């Protein structure tokens, strides 16, 4: 009798309640049917009569963002679908009740963000997609999931996450045991019949390379399925795992990929952010900060005209066609909406990094300037050698002009030695005139000898002049060789030889002045001696 009574109450409850997910609760004698929002057709299209108290979480004010965006987005979506694709509008389900949402949260042990609650209180996903041909998912072919589907798919992904975590844990335990037993006994990974631990005495009688071979293949026996490394965009915004119990799917492509909310974000993520995850997404993407912003971006695409209705068949009763994405501005081809969301997520992250790092170009410029300004020692030596070579060429030209113009300049101290030697010979040839009385006593003999000596002195002076000219010419020739040698030596030895050349050049004018003064004195002395002899 009690069982029949319970069945009758469940039947009455199913006809009288607006709950779509929650079942009849025997403990609640008076289920909160009135708590569901009574809406007319216009209210279902616009959602204007829904009170915020129906889905606002008073205990978590920070989780209430996105409510206004969700209400505004659904107003535009309902208007657009009723105008352009009534068949698509007919697939949108009736709203959930608060009782449905509370039971779903209890089953999943979560609390939906306020924007998700608002969306479920307007439309509980899509239905009748199979019976209504010519229509597809609301989000450019992606289906909006109902509350019942959300709970079932969340449990499925949680089972995947738990299995992966359990396998990782088992693998870690077995690896630890293998490391402990390595060297004493061999723990074979295969636990079938006929396999077990080998004692030390048995192990010695077997192949000595057995333990090494087992250790090399040990990881292969317990290797997980081929799951590549997981990433996220932006980095660290989403946990880098294949599946997580905090990811709640809300939209599906019916192929294992989802758009959902993240209730367990990464270190740099945000609670309630909208992400892309699934079988084909080893890199997870953040597409919106909350569910309301995502709905508003979809409504914006509809208002901008980024859509097409494609009817692949000729059936007149098939409806207007399936809604697909096409960028109106670029007049591009039809694109998958998941690919569009991935592209937008990458572009948003790239623009964010460019704004966040404005100093990076400056640093590169400064480093390049610094590298240009810094000259290596070898380069400095080469530049110094080229400058010195040009200076040497200028000095060569100036010296050649001086040598051709004035032959009396003497630049080699060796020439001074020849000149002084010739003057000394001339002085030896001259007679001693220290006693004038002897000269007067001799008379005519002295005059003859004086004439003879005068001729000899003039010849000596001419010989000295010719010797001077020869000395100047010889001094000019050896000077060219040291300069050529100094150029070669400066290229090889560098700055040390250059300093020596500059020192020798500074000493040359001093030597020239000394030789000129000494030559002038010797010439004047010869003139005085000649005058005395003549007298």
UniProtKB/Swiss-Prot annotation:
InterPro entries per record? Knr4/Smi1, Knr4/Smi1-like_dom, Knr4/Smi1-like_sf, KNR4/SMI1_regulator
A single GO cellular-component term on record: mating projection tip
- Biased amino acid composition, Basic and acidic residues: 354-363, 474-483, 495-509, 524-535
Chain spans, region Disordered: 354-535
Which stretches are tagged as biased composition: Polar residues?
364-384, 397-407, 456-469
Q: Where is the composition biased (Basic residues)?
A: 484-494
GO process annotations (BP): fungal-type cell wall beta-glucan biosynthetic process
- Signal peptide extent: none
A Pfam family this chain is assigned to: SMI1_KNR4
PANTHER family the record matches: CELL WALL ASSEMBLY REGULATOR SMI1 (PTHR47432:SF1)
Please give the family membership noted in the entry.
Belongs to the KNR4/SMI1 family.
Q: What is this protein called?
A: KNR4/SMI1 homolog
């Amino acid at each position: 009798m009690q069982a029949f009574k319970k069945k009758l109450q469940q039947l009455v409850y199913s006809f009288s309640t607006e709950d779509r997910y929650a079942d009849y609760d025997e403990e609640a004698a008076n289920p909160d049917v009135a708590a569901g929002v009574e809406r007319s057709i216009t209210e279902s299209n616009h959602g204007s009569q829904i009170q915020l108290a129906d889905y606002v979480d008073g205990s978590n004010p920070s989780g209430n963002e996105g409510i206004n965006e969700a209400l505004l987005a659904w107003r535009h979506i309902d208007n657009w679908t009723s105008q352009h694709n009534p068949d698509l509008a007919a697939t949108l389900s009736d709203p959930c009740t608060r009782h449905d949402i509370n039971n779903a949260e209890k089953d999943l042990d979560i609390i939906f963000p306020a924007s998700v609650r608002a969306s479920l209180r307007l439309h509980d996903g899509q239905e009748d997609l199979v019976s209504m041909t010519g229509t597809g998912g609301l989000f450019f072919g992606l289906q909006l999931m109902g509350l019942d589907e959300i709970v079932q798919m969340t449990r499925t992904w949680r089972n995947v996450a738990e299995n992966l975590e359990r396998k990782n844990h088992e693998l870690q335990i077995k690896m630890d045991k293998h490391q402990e037993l390595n060297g004493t006994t061999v723990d074979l990974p295969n636990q079938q019949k006929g396999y077990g631990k080998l004692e030390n005495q048995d192990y010695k009688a077997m192949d000595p390379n057995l333990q090494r071979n087992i250790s090399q293949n040990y990881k292969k026996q317990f290797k997980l399925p081929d799951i590549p490394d997981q990433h996220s965009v932006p980095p660290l915004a989403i946990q880098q795992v294949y599946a997580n119990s905090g990811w709640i799917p809300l939209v599906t492509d019916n192929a294992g990929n989802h758009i959902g909310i993240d209730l367990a974000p990464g270190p740099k993520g945000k609670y309630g952010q909208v992400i892309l995850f699934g079988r084909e997404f080893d890199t997870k993407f953040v597409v919106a900060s909350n569910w309301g912003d995502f709905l508003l971006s979809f409504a914006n695409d509809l208002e901008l005209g980024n859509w097409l209705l494609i009817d692949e068949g000729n059936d007149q009763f098939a409806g207007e066609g399936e809604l697909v994405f096409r960028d109106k501005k670029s007049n591009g081809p039809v694109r998958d909406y998941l690919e569009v969301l991935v592209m937008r997520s990458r572009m948003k992250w790239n623009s964010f990094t460019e704004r966040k790092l404005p100093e990076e170009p400056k640093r590169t410029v400064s480093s390049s300037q610094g590298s240009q300004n810094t000259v290596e020692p070898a380069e400095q030596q080469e530049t110094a050698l080229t400058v010195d070579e040009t200076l040497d060429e200028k000095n060569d030209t100036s010296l050649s002009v001086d040598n051709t113009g004035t032959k009396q300049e003497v630049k080699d101290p060796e020439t001074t030695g020849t000149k002084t030697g010739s003057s000394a010979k001339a002085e030896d040839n001259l007679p001693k005139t220290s006693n004038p009385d002897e000269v007067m006593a001799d008379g005519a003999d002295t005059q003859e000898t004086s004439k003879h000596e005068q001729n000899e002195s003039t010849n000596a002076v001419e010989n000295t002049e010719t010797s001077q000219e020869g000395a100047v010419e010889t001094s000019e020739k050896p000077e060219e060789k040291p300069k050529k040698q100094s150029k070669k030596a400066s290229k090889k030895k560098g700055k040390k030889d250059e300093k020596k050349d500059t020192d020798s050049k500074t000493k040359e004018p001093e030597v020239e002045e000394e030789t000129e003064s000494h030559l002038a004195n010797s010439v004047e002395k010869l003139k005085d001696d000649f005058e005395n002899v003549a007298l």
